[in-house]
Amino acid sequence: MAEISLRDVRKSYAGIEVIHGVDLEIADGEFVVIVGPSGCGKSTLLRMVAGLEEITAGEIAIGGRVVNRLEPRERDIAMVFQNYALYPHMTVRENMAYGLRIAKLSKAEIEERVARSARMLELGQLLDRKPRQLSGGQRQRVAMGRALVRNPAAFLLDEPLSNLDAKLRVQMRLQIKELQRTVRTTSIYVTHDQVEAMTLADRLVVMNAGVAEQIATPAEIYDRPATTFVAGFIGSPAMNMLPARGLGDALEVAGQRLAVPAPAGRDLILGVRPEHLHAAGPEEPGFELHVQAVEWLGADAFAHGRLADGTDLVLRTPGKAPVRERDRLKVAPDAAALHLFDAETGKRL
């Protein structure tokens, strides 16, 4: 195991910078998830750590050793890819042992490592099968087993669950979490799926257009997003964003005055998560929501509607709550769960 350090890491293609000075310190044994939309630079950043992409500027160190000029095989890392990358003509046992044979480990050591990893990943009954005889989830476990047997300093996982169906993704998430709890190997995991990110990570790196917008624990990112991008990306449905105007001792939002101190004369964004809206009392300041659609999910329902000024709003309600399309509701935000952002910069106040 080892710590991983990225210092002002940059990447350019044809003179155009696509990764803009990322700084990240990953502790020994920590599980860090890099999350963001397609094209944000998360896989490029992972590939630079792996040595599959050259860095344009900055420094990457693994276990205190600068690896900028080292080949992937010299970095003591193991990668797990989205497409499994298994040898189709080899059995599960042979796939898992292949890298160890190349490293010229003894037969006894290879057998012991394969057997131990197979037990961890519940692959014992599959060791003599070929990849074509396995399900998608089983293939991904074999790919993880092949990485695990190497006892690397770090695991790098690039969207490993993307090819699996929803049920298998849940199963594999739980297995990855249990595996990390057992082996405590330093890991960087890339995904666009916020559920994977929130459930697996010790810390998250939220990427946007080559910039690490926020690096924090899942709870901190959900409760105190640093920017409107982070607030809108993490959480489903996304946080409601309401144009607002600071009045000093209050906030003007959608024609209503809320008793929320805010810089006078400043254009702001008020962020409210769907679960932090409630039915307003008769004397309570609130917004009239014209419900246009209701998504019923069983335990919960999401009412999608529009305010008088045309702003879209989503309200989370209990699944049994009698909210219907075309209803008009008076709703108010929970005062303790408001988020204020600068309208120009998008940064949290």
From Swiss-Prot:
The organism of origin for this protein: Cereibacter sphaeroides (strain ATCC 17029 / ATH 2.4.9)
Binding site for ATP: 36-43
Described function: Part of the ABC transporter complex UgpBAEC involved in sn-glycerol-3-phosphate (G3P) import. Responsible for energy coupling to the transport system.
Subunit architecture: The complex is composed of two ATP-binding proteins (UgpC), two transmembrane proteins (UgpA and UgpE) and a solute-binding protein (UgpB).
Similarity-based family: Belongs to the ABC transporter superfamily. sn-glycerol-3-phosphate importer (TC 3.A.1.1.3) family.
Membrane disposition: Peripheral membrane protein
Reactions performed catalytically: sn-glycerol 3-phosphate(out) + ATP + H2O = sn-glycerol 3-phosphate(in) + ADP + phosphate + H(+)
Transmembrane segments: none
Domain ABC transporter: 4-234
EC number, as in UniProt: 7.6.2.10
Domain of life: Bacteria
Protein name: sn-glycerol-3-phosphate import ATP-binding protein UgpC
Compartments reported by the entry: Cell inner membrane
Taxonomic placement: Bacteria, Pseudomonadati, Pseudomonadota, Alphaproteobacteria, Rhodobacterales
